[in-house]
């Protein structure tokens, strides 16, 4: 299983104070020196709430690890990434809503202009991945547009797992719709969410598409996904950075790597 480390929220700390620390390149090399991280993931959002254009340029120039850039189909961002001298190893196209706290679901593959943006990246020799819900129609769209990799949105699975097996339902930001469900209901929905991820990962494999996954994954809920043999990559960020605040980034990375690289 490949481990993609999302370092957006290291930059969030910097941007909260509009200062120079923490330094994104220091985080990059801490990750690299663990020898456990396979790629670095960043999300270049339209509102630039964390990652900035300058961060993209620095990482692509210096990084010894592959860089996966998440972004919307915004024309300005597409033009910027297509114009780069140093290319990312892949671009993952994600949905984006400026009012969201974090990405809320998979891409709507009927989105106007999506096919054109995919072609623009392909024409520049940049691999494209699509951040999608684990649905067959989305996989067929990927295949029709010569997309060789997808990332399944694991938010539904992760939230259900957290509600059932952690203290999430007793916290200030508990998800109200899950808080009102019984343990039996949560277990059934979690089982179905896992089965759907497993089915669609297998479907992707038979379609010649590499299946990755990410969103809301943490040190508790990630373990079950290791039972899906056709899942090749996990992208994880917030939980690692959250633990890093308490134990340090190197230790946080190593603890996660120990779980997913058995």
Swiss-Prot record:
It holds the Pfam family PdxJ. Its main location: cytoplasm. The active site is at 43 (proton acceptor), 70 (proton acceptor), 215 (proton donor). The keyword Transcription does not apply. Gene3D superfamilies: Aldolase class I (3.20.20.70). GO terms for biological process: pyridoxine biosynthetic process. InterPro entries: Aldolase_TIM (IPR013785), PyrdxlP_synth_PdxJ (IPR004569), Pyridoxine-5'_phos_synth (IPR036130). SUPFAM superfamilies: Pyridoxine 5'-phosphate synthase. Homooctamer; tetramer of dimers. Catalyzes the complicated ring closure reaction between the two acyclic compounds 1-deoxy-D-xylulose-5-phosphate (DXP) and 3-amino-2-oxopropyl phosphate (1-amino-acetone-3-phosphate or AAP) to form pyridoxine 5'-phosphate (PNP) and inorganic phosphate. This is Pyridoxine 5'-phosphate synthase. It comes from Helicobacter pylori (strain ATCC 700392 / 26695) (Campylobacter pylori). The lineage of its organism: Bacteria, Pseudomonadati, Campylobacterota, Epsilonproteobacteria, Campylobacterales.
């Amino acid at each position: 299983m490949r481990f993609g480390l999302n370092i957006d929220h290291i930059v969030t700390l910097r941007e909260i104070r509009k200062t120079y620390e923490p330094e994104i390149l220091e985080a990059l090399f801490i990750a690299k020196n663990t020898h456990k991280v396979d790629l670095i993931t960043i999300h270049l959002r339209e509102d630039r709430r964390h990652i900035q254009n300058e961060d993209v340029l620095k990482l692509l120039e210096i990084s010894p690890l592959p860089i996966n850039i998440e972004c919307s189909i915004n024309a300005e961002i597409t033009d910027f990434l297509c114009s780069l001298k140093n290319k990312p190893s892949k671009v993952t196209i994600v949905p984006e809503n400026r009012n969201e706290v974090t990405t809320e679901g998979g891409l709507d593959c009927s989105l106007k202009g999506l096919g054109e943006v995919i072609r623009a990246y392909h024409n520049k020799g940049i691999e494209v991945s699509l951040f999608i819900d684990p649905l067959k129609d989305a996989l067929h769209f990927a295949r029709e547009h010569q997309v060789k990799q997808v990332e399944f949105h694991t938010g539904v699975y992760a939230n259900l797992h957290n509600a059932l097996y952690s203290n999430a339902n007793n916290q200030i930001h508990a998800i109200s719709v899950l808080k009102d469900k019984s343990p039996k209901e949560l277990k059934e929905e979690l089982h179905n969410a896992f089965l759907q991820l497993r089915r669609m990962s297998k479907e992707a494999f038979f379609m010649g598409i590499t299946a990755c996954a990410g969103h809301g994954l943490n040190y508790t809920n990630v373990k079950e996904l290791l039972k899906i043999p056709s899942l090749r990559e996990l992208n994880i960020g917030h939980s690692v950075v959250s633990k890093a605040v308490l134990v340090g980034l190197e230790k946080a990375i190593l603890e996660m790597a120990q779980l997913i690289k058995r």
